[in-house]
C-alpha cells in the first residue's frame, strides 16, 4: 500500500471516529487536498472508503462520513465526481434503503436524499463535464419512482456547487481537460469490459492529437468569455456615470459586487495577455480591455472617496477605451468568427452571467454515458433485483445491470439518431428536453419532449413558450397535448424548425413554462444551449 493511500485511510478513520460527534472541517479539507494532489486511483479509493463508512451501523460514523462526502464533492475535481456518479458507488450509497420508503426516514437516509438532490440540482446541471454524471439523475428518478421524497435544499448549499463558470486562460482549460480525460481513461481501463477498452482506445487517440486539434477551440472559448467581461465592464461604466453626489456607495451593494467581480477578472486578463503574443489578432483587444477595467476601478475608487471631479475625468477616458475595445474586436471578427457568433446569439437572449449554460470545450462523447432521454423507469423497476456488479449486500434500490448498457424504451415521438439530447429544465414534476431530429447546413429540426417525473401528481394545462435569437427564424408546431399523467415519459412533444443557422453548432434558446399541479399554477423561465452536433 502506498504512503498516500495509508495516509488517506488514516485521515478518513480520524474524520469518522464515533467519539468525535461533530465533523472536523480541518481533517475533511485535508482529505480533499490529498485527493486533489495525489490523483491516480486515490479518488476512487477515497469515494468507496467513505461510502463504506456511510453504511456503518453506528449512526455517528455514518453522519460524519456523509459530512466528509459533502466536503469532498464540493472541493474535489472531476476525478472524484466521476466516482460518485458511478452505478457502483450510488448503489452502495443507498444500500440501506428499502424498496418502499418507511413511514419515517432516519437522519442518515434524509442526509443521503439531500446530497443526491443537491448534486442533481447543481453539478448535474452546471458542471463542465455534466454528461458524465447522468447516473446521479437516474438514481434520483429511481428513488422518486419508488416513493421517496427529496427534501428542499437551502440556497446557500446550492450556491457552493452552482457557481458561475470563471474566466480561464486557454492553458488552464487545456490542463483541466487533460486531467479529466486522464481520470476517465483510468476508469475505463479499470472497468476493462470490451466496450470500455474500445472507448479507452478512442480516448487515447484523442489525447494524442489534442494539442493541435483543440487549441483553437480553447482560444475561441477564451474570447467568448472576454466578451462577457467587456459587457460587464460596459454595464459597470454606465452605472458609475449615473452616480450623483447625493448617492452613497456602500460595501456589499451592487456596485461593490461588480467591482469585486472585475478585480477578479482583471487578474485573469493579465494572465491571458501574458500567454498571448503581440502578433496575435486579439492582442490589442485584450490589452484595451485590461486598460478599461483598470480605469473603471479607478473611477469607482474616486466615487467611493467622494472625488466626483476626478471620477468625471476618468469617465471620459473610459468611453474612449470602451470604443477602442469595440473597434478592435470588430477588426478581429473574421479570425474569431465562431466565438463572436456564439456570443452575439447569447447576447440577444441571456443575462450578464451566462457562464453556467455556455458550453465549454469538453471531453469527447463516451459510450459509457447514459443520456437522460434513454432512461426508462418501467423497464428499470422490473429488474431492480437483477444482477448488479456491486457488493453482494446491495439492497433493494439499485440501478440496472451494465454500466455501459442503459435501458431504453424508444418512444415513437423521440428521434433515434446520433444527436445529443439537452435537458433544458427539470424539477420534481417536469423534465423538458430538446433533441435535434435532423440538420442541414442552415436548418435544424428540433423535438421538444416533456416527461412527468412525479409518481403521484398529474401535470395539467402545460404551455411552453420558446424563443431563439432574432437572427434566426423559428417555426413552432402545435404541442401534442397539455396534460401529463404520473410518470408519463415524453407524453407531450412539439416540433420546432430553426433556419438561417449557417453552420452553427450550438443554439441558445430561452423558454417559459406554465402548468398546474394539484390546482396550483406553476411558472418557470430559463435558458439553455442546444448542441446541434
From Swiss-Prot:
Stretches assigned to the GAT domain: 178-305
Principal location class: Golgi
Record-linked Gene3D superfamilies: 1.20.5.170, 1.20.58.160, 1.25.40.90, 2.60.40.1230
Positions of post-translational Phosphoserine modification: 320
Any GO CC annotation of this UniProt entry: Golgi apparatus
Role according to the record: May play a role in the regulation of membrane traffic through the trans-Golgi network.
Family, per entry: Belongs to the GGA protein family.
Protein name: Probable ADP-ribosylation factor-binding protein C25H2.16c
Amino acid at each position: 500500500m502506498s504512503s498516500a493511500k495509508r495516509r488517506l485511510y488514516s485521515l478518513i478513520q480520524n474524520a469518522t471516529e464515533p467519539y468525535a460527534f461533530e465533523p472536523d472541517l480541518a481533517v475533511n479539507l485535508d482529505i480533499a487536498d490529498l485527493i486533489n494532489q495525489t490523483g491516480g486511483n486515490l479518488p476512487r479509493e477515497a469515494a468507496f472508503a467513505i461510502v463504506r463508512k456511510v453504511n456503518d451501523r453506528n449512526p455517528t460514523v455514518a453522519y460524519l462520513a456523509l459530512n466528509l462526502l459533502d466536503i469532498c464533492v464540493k472541493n474535489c475535481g472531476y476525478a472524484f465526481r466521476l466516482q460518485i456518479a458511478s452505478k457502483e458507488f450510488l448503489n452502495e450509497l443507498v444500500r440501506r434503503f428499502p424498496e418502499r420508503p418507511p413511514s419515517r426516514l432516519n437522519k442518515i437516509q434524509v442526509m443521503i436524499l439531500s446530497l443526491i438532490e443537491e448534486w442533481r440540482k447543481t453539478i448535474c446541471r452546471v458542471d463542465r463535464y455534466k454528461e458524465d454524471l447522468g447516473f446521479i439523475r437516474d438514481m434520483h428518478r429511481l428513488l422518486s419512482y419508488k416513493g421517496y421524497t427529496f427534501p428542499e435544499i437551502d440556497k446557500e448549499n446550492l450556491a457552493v456547487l452552482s457557481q458561475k463558470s470563471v474566466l480561464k486562460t486557454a492553458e488552464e482549460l487545456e490542463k483541466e481537460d487533460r486531467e479529466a480525460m486522464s481520470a476517465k481513461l483510468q476508469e475505463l481501463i479499470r472497468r476493462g469490459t470490451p466496450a470500455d477498452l474500445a472507448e479507452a482506445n478512442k480516448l487515447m487517440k484523442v489525447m494524442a492529437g489534442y494539442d493541435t486539434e483543440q487549441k483553437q477551440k480553447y482560444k475561441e472559448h477564451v474570447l467568448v468569455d472576454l466578451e462577457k467581461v467587456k459587457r460587464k465592464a460596459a454595464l459597470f461604466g454606465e452605472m458609475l456615470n449615473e452616480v450623483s453626489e447625493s448617492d452613497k456607495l456602500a460595501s456589499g451593494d451592487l456596485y461593490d459586487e461588480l467591482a469585486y467581480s472585475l478585480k477578479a477578472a482583471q487578474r485573469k486578463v493579465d494572465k491571458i495577455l501574458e500567454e498571448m503574443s503581440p502578433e496575435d489578432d486579439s492582442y490589442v483587444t485584450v490589452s484595451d480591455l485590461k486598460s478599461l477595467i483598470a480605469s473603471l476601478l479607478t473611477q469607482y475608487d474616486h466615487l467611493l472617496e467622494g472625488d466626483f471631479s476626478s471620477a468625471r475625468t476618468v469617465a471620459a477616458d473610459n468611453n474612449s477605451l470602451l470604443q477602442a475595445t469595440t473597434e478592435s474586436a470588430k477588426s478581429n471578427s473574421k479570425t474569431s468568427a465562431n466565438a463572436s457568433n456564439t456570443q452575439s446569439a447569447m447576447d440577444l437572449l441571456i443575462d450578464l452571467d451566462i457562464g453556467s449554460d455556455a458550453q465549454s470545450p469538453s471531453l469527447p462523447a463516451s459510450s459509457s454515458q447514459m443520456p437522460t432521454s434513454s432512461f426508462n423507469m418501467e423497464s428499470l423497476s422490473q429488474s431492480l433485483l437483477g444482477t448488479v456488479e456491486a457488493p453482494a449486500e446491495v439492497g433493494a434500490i439499485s440501478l440496472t445491470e451494465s454500466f455501459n448498457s442503459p435501458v431504453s424504451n424508444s418512444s415513437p415521438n423521440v428521434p433515434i439518431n446520433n444527436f445529443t439530447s439537452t435537458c433544458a429544465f427539470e424539477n420534481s414534476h417536469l423534465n423538458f428536453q430538446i433533441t435535434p431530429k435532423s440538420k442541414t447546413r442552415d436548418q435544424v429540426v428540433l423535438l421538444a419532449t416533456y416527461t412527468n417525473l412525479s409518481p403521484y401528481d398529474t401535470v395539467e394545462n402545460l404551455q411552453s413558450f420558446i424563443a431563439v435569437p432574432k437572427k434566426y427564424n423559428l417555426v413552432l408546431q402545435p404541442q401534442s397535448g397539455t396534460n401529463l399523467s404520473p410518470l408519463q415519459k415524453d407524453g407531450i412533444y412539439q416540433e420546432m424548425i430553426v433556419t438561417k443557422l449557417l453552420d452553427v453548432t450550438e443554439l441558445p434558446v430561452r423558454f417559459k413554462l406554465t402548468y398546474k399541479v394539484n390546482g396550483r399554477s406553476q411558472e418557470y423561465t430559463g435558458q439553455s444551449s442546444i448542441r446541434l452536433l
